[in-house]
Amino acid sequence: MSRKIDTSKQFLEFYVKKGLYLVELSENHFKNKEYKKCLELLSQAHGMFEKGGVKDEAEKVKARFNDIKKNFFKSTKT
């Protein structure tokens, strides 16, 4: 009879670490004025934090995403 191993805690830790890495990487792209790539990475980080269950970090990333989008991209609405 095989026993199942509970790896859910490890997955949550992985999601948080991956989210932190993506935020750090996005900051490098931001400094290099690669705003589109920065937004892509922040979007991915937001998803990782959501999966990892750290809603406060996800909200911080979302706020940063919206701030960059508002300040560095022009609205296409006419």
Question: Which residues make up each language-model segment?
Answer:
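Alpha-helical linker/edge segments of TPR/alpha-solenoid repeat scaffolds
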Residues: I5, A63-T78
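Start-of-helix signal in alpha-solenoid helical-repeat scaffolds, especially tetratricopeptide repeats
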Residues: I5, L12, K17-L20, C38-L39, ...
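Structural signature of alpha-solenoid helical repeat scaffolds
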Residues: D6, F11-E13, K33, G53
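Structural register within alpha-helical repeat arrays
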Residues: K18, L25, N32, Q44-A45, ...
